Amino acid sequence: MHGFILFVTYTMKHGTREEFLREVKECGVLEEIRREKGCLGYDYYYPVDKSDELCILEKWEKEEDQIRHLDQPHMDKIKVLKSRYVLDTQMEGIKC
């Protein structure tokens, strides 16, 4: 497989992870992201031993697709939610 994988870790405000995920699902942004050109996968995961962290595994055909994704209008929904619930964001990208 050729492509770009991005592993994102959010440090959440204490006790807000479930509320953040509920709002992400309700606003429909996941479906919009998954329909973007070049998106091969976009999934949330929980670290087993860190209740205030949330991880995203993004899979893209090309790194350029992931960069374009950040400027999509529906990403404004995520930015608003992150401002309410997320303290810090760490990212690690891998070209494969």
Model-based region annotation:
Residues 2-17, 22:
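Short, structured interface segments that constitute the first stable element of a domain
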Residues 23, 45, 69-72, 81:
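Residue-level signal for well-ordered alpha-helical positions
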Residues 2-5, 40-52, 77-96:
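Glycine-rich beta-strand-turn "strand-cap" elements at beta-sheet edges
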Residues 13, 71-74, 87:
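Charged, amphipathic alpha-helical interaction segments
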Residues 16-40, 74-77:
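Short amphipathic alpha-helical segments
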Residues 4-11, 41-70:
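Short, well-ordered beta-strand segments in beta-rich or mixed alpha/beta enzyme
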